[in-house]
């Protein structure tokens, strides 16, 4: 039987992660204590759905900032790919590389999915909202790449 990775719930403590960002700098979630964070997990930089989702986060970035949130995108892509993705789409938020799915698994954003009729295990499009104390406000799993940021803004307003 495949290993299961539990999903997070409100009031859980967000797991500590240490990953490389788009500039090859080490990013630790604990360094954002005192700030509210939206950590969104996406399967593949440059794919149509992930590009749309990233563009929507960028278009809504000022609204999230007004609500006191930073945005961090996390994918299994390597650093050069997320750097290229960030530059190509002029993304003004941090992207993190998680090629071994360490953060994905810790946040419950990894599991079985179906693509073109084929089942496999990989990144699940998910969003975890974290308060300034490092506690989960909400965790949303298997979200849609379109319309997600609008729904998120409505939830947080």
Label every PLM stretch briefly:
Residues 1-157:
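Chalcogenol-based redox active-site neighborhoods
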């Amino acid at each position: 039987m495949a290993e299961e990775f539990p999903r997070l719930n409100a009031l859980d403590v967000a797991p500590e992660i240490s990953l490389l960002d788009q500039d090859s700098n080490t990013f630790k979630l604990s360094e954002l204590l005192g700030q509210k964070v939206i950590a969104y997990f996406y399967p593949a930089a440059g794919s149509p759905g992930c590009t749309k989702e990233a563009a929507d986060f960028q278009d809504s970035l000022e609204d999230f900032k007004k609500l006191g949130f930073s945005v961090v995108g996390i994918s299994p892509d390597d650093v050069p790919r997320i750097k290229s993705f960030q530059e190509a789409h002029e993304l003004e938020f941090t992207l993190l590389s998680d090629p071994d799915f360490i953060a994905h698994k810790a946040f419950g954003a990894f599991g079985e999915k179906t693509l073109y009729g084929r089942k496999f295990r990989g990144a699940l499009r998910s969003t975890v909202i974290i308060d300034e104390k490092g506690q989960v406000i909400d965790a949303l799993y298997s979200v849609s790449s379109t319309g997600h940021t609008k729904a998120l803004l409505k939830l947080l307003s």
